[in-house]
């Protein structure tokens, strides 16, 4: 059941009374100033934060430690939505040690998002890339494909200049995907 108080929506269950003091907890999603977080998991990935209007709030290469990840994401936990790339079981051709490292790092990201109560959706690379109408050619190697993605990110965010790197381009495109689909 929704209740309307001047200019804000509140849920009846979010009203809390403590010794004559009433606090109202704002429902997520009712604020128009939503932040969209895009995460390209992995040690060589990145995190991008976009405002609702498409302007870039922040973009960084992947923080190194779990504490750094948590500290960075906690800056943007209010009224945010996150889309994280669902790579599945790792990257084909990697050693078992590299796959385990990737899985551990991915778990750290997911736990940080869970601890901060940030609504999160996993999306496959095929799904978010389809929004940009890009197709990988069979003769393209990984570096050539990453350069295509980097060029697309640079065309969407020309104001960033050198901040669009091979580490951050996927995160920027994923956060723009989240903004466009209004997750």
Question: Which sequence ranges carry the predicted segments?
Answer:
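Phosphate- and other anionic-substrate recognition elements at nucleic-acid/protein interfaces
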Residues: 5-183
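Methionine residue identity
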Residues: 1-2
């Amino acid at each position: 059941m929704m209740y309307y108080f001047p200019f804000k929506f509140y849920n009846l269950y979010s009203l809390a009374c403590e010794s004559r003091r009433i606090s109202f907890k704002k429902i997520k999603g009712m604020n128009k100033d939503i932040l969209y977080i895009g995460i390209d998991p992995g040690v060589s990935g990145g995190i991008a934060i976009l405002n609702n209007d498409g302007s870039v709030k922040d973009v960084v290469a992947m923080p190194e430690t779990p504490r750094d990840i948590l500290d960075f994401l906690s800056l943007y936990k209010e009224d945010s939505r996150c889309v994280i790339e669902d790579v599945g079981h790792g990257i084909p051709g990697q050693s078992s040690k590299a796959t385990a490292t990737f899985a551990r790092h991915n778990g750290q990201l997911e736990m940080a998002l869970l601890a901060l109560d940030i609504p999160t959706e996993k999306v496959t690379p095929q799904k978010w890339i389809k929004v940009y109408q890009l197709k990988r050619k069979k003769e393209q190697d990984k570096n050539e494909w990453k350069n295509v993605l980097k060029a697309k990110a640079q065309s969407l965010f020309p104001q960033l200049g050198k901040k669009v790197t091979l580490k951050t381009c996927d995160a920027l495109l994923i956060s723009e995907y989240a903004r466009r689909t209004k997750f």
